[in-house]
From Swiss-Prot:
This is Probable RNA 2'-phosphotransferase. HAMAP family: KptA. It comes from the Bacteria. Its EC number is 2.7.1.-. One of its GO terms (molecular function) is NAD+ poly-ADP-ribosyltransferase activity. The keyword Acetylation does not apply. Keywords: NAD, Transferase. The keyword Calcium does not apply.
Amino acid sequence: MEQARQVKISKFLSKHLRHTPERLGLVLAPGGWVAVDELLSACASHQFPISRADLEQVVSNNDKQRFSFDETATKIRANQGHSVEVDLQLQPQLPPPILYHGTGEKSVPAILKSGLLKMSRHHVHLSKDIETARTVGIRHGKPVIFSVDAMVMYQSGFTFYCSDNGVYLVDHVPPEYLHMMN
């Protein structure tokens, strides 16, 4: 499958598995799962046919690992980034000492004042490495990277989760745990 087609499918899946499942007539089960057959049927009935092979290729080749299959490969979900109410059934995790967050330069004043807020999402997304954070930041303009004192936050009572694709999730990062790197 061509790269352009993979990107188009990935964007379509992101939109409907994270934000608007109801537009395809889908209901996310606990954990954010939806039956693969149900998804493929819904896509076809909404003039966006996807084959099982296409779906498998998008899941396995997505560099950000946005999606995953369950153990039986009969269900699929978006790993994080939902704006719709969903319980991903993630377990609390001990974070590494430092995590990173990439953003655009225009967001810096608000972040320095209020910290990192989840906005329309369920969690703030944090990366394990600077390069991933920089890649995220570039999507928002000139990138700015913040380091996050994750272990200090954890020791102060904040709960961290880690999604299937290795992104750490937390409800909020107050400004006192943030350090602008660049």
